[in-house]
Amino acid sequence: MSADVSTTPAAENVNGAAEASPAPAAAAPSATTPEVTAVENSTPAPAANQPHSASLYVGELDPSVTEAMLYELFSSIGQVASIRVCRDAVTRRSLGYAYVNYNNTADGERALEDLNYTLIKGKPCRIMWSQRDPALRKTGQGNVFIKNLDSAIDNKALHDTFAAFGNILSCKVAQDEFGNSKGYGFVHYETAEAANNAIKHVNGMLLNDKKVFVGHHISKKDRQSKFEEMKANFTNVYIKNLDSEIDDDEFRKMFEKFGEITSATLSRDQEGKSRGFGFVNFSTHESAQAAVEEMNDKEIRSQKLYVGRAQKKHEREEELRKQYEAARLEKASKYQGVNLYVKNLTDDIDDEKLRELFGPYGTITSAKVMRDTNVERDQSPDSAGKEKEADKENDKEATPEAEKAEKAEEKPSESSEEKDKEAKKSDKKPFGKSKGFGFVCFSSPDEASKAVTEMNQRMVNGKPLYVALAQRKDVRRSQLEASIQARNTIRQQQAAAAAGMPQPYMQPAVFYGPGQQGFIPGGQRGMAFPPQPGMVMGIPGGRPGQYPGPFPGQQGGRGMGPNQQIPPNFAQGIPMGMQGPGGIPNGMGYPQMAQVQFGRGAGGRGQVPGMPMGQGMRGGPGYGQGRGAPVQQGQMRPGQGGRGQNAAAPAGPQEGAAGGVNAQTLGAAPPAQQKQMLGEALYPKIQAQQPELAGKITGMLLEMDNTELLSLTRKPCAPRSMRPLAFTMST
């Protein structure tokens, strides 16, 4: 039976030798349709006298091969129209194959003849005509399977051997992950007659002193159905747990009563001793089935035998893999939602203390603190001194007087059983330094959820615990890759924004502290998509590039309505060059955060109450009244904002002081404003301790729950205790 090789888009893009392609593309089915600019033939099968397209498939490429490397090689043949290395749609890693398109077919024929099996980055490439029609690729006509190949035979040697029987479309020797030959390969001829001719002349011949088998390739589907039929009609029986004293004659007589035996053998080692298992092959399936049913689990010479159908190695490995996968899934579903991960533990917390901490929240099935098992227990000075004394005693001469003195000094203090118990207790004690994390498993998801709610961020021995549901390593890795990819995307968008390039999508809103770089909190509720850093969010109902309703600089406005609002620190943190008249960012919206209203005025020229006067603002410093009379920095005249200014509004900026944030005001505020209020309360405290990282650390802390943030605002030194954690996260 022919062996199987994983199929890939590379194989499907060439011809019927689907099983003769590399395996990397199986992880990225989304990248299976490369862009090939050349025109393809639509004939049922390529013939020798028909012109090919100018598109070539290049396989067996190293993952580091790029389009530039291929262009340097293939441009020596003729003018190259395009080159594309096919990559995974998600990771953008090379799938190991590419397409090279020439402007004319003659150059493609020369490249196929001259460059096939050329070394690229130390690996011989495999070149063939591209065939995009899947029906033509999967016909299998002319596909030949060769097995029992010598390990020295590579793709080129196999091609040279079988090229005498006809035009070869594809030729490949299967290799493992280390590049070693698996002992079989495939040759796809252009016609079925050439394939039959190769089978007739090469099958049973010697290649490098090894007799090879050459036959028509059987598809995986047909092989699978044939394999199932063979399993249902097995004749070969495997027996294990045999006594080592059983010889070949006795072994054969044990199974002769079930039917005619064609062969029976015991496996022996190099010394000729039985290895405890053997094989019996019957002439009929019924005899083999009867032997399995009667002899399985039967005791012979005090050993229970195992008798079953003989399996090949790959079949046993596949069965074990399925059993392991089923056990893993069962275990994962069993502990789904009940297993907790606890980190930031102090060194003095062991398994018992961890169980005591989480015991009040439910029934704990297991609790374990992970420790470094490679660290051996250090010997105490007392034990070291006792060992030295024992060594000195052992150095004494064993005289009769000394033996009598030792017997006289012996006391019936402890029995050997008590000593054994103490030794067992000492062995059970955990050794090695704590890794600072552990796991707690509850009996129900409700108990685990309650423990997460109550114990997360709780201070234990001066350190806040981190408690969350335990996740598998592959899940954590995928989440980490997703977060890294999102972070890289944000950096790319920021770089593009700095260069003035258009953005494909907008980024989360940024909280700006006074004179600080902004940080990026989570997305706000109600936002269709978050705005760019350095920008502020638009109000629902506004058109892109404009503020909702009339505003200075827009047409058709007589001032803002009474329900239109603007934040108190609106102008702070906006980069230079992005402000329009009045300090407003050009073409950008603003969030509804501060409850400050405009008064109705002509032309909408009113000063925004509670908004700091920016340089160059209408009515602000540097912008004079009437003919531009100068106003000193920090001064403000009554009525300076124009006719639309609200007389009852305060002239200075309004700030949310830390003392003004309490649970009542926080609960009354909308969710989008709560984080802003807490950030404004925490920012001054953190800025006093970390001026350079104040904005970033504040952003990190705002990822915590609002109740915890509220408690931090009430404690003057609370941010100091959180500083190491936030500082670590920020770096």
From Swiss-Prot:
Polar residues: compositionally biased ranges: 1-10
Record GO biological process: mRNA processing; mRNA transport; regulation of translation
Coiled-coil stretches noted in the UniProt entry, renumbered to this chain: none
Localization of this protein: Cytoplasm; Nucleus
Keywords annotated in UniProt: Cytoplasm, mRNA processing, mRNA transport, Nucleus, Repeat, RNA-binding, Translation regulation, Transport
Pfam entry (one): RRM_1
Highest taxon, organism lineage: Eukaryota
Compositional bias ranges of the Low complexity kind: 17-39, 645-656
Domain PABC residues, every copy: 658-731
GO cellular component term of the entry, any: cytoplasm
Biased composition (Gly residues): 616-627
Domain RRM stretches: 54-132, 142-219, 235-312, 338-472
Region (Disordered) residue spans: 1-51, 369-429, 603-665
Gene Ontology MF terms in the entry: RNA binding
Similarity comment: family membership: Belongs to the polyadenylate-binding protein type-1 family.
Task performed by this protein: Binds the poly(A) tail of mRNA. Appears to be an important mediator of the multiple roles of the poly(A) tail in mRNA biogenesis, stability and translation. In the nucleus, involved in both mRNA cleavage and polyadenylation. Is also required for efficient mRNA export to the cytoplasm. Acts in concert with a poly(A)-specific nuclease (PAN) to affect poly(A) tail shortening, which may occur concomitantly with either nucleocytoplasmic mRNA transport or translational initiation.
Family matches, as PANTHER family: RNA BINDING PROTEIN
Name this protein carries in UniProt: Polyadenylate-binding protein, cytoplasmic and nuclear
Originating organism: Aspergillus niger (strain ATCC MYA-4892 / CBS 513.88 / FGSC A1513)
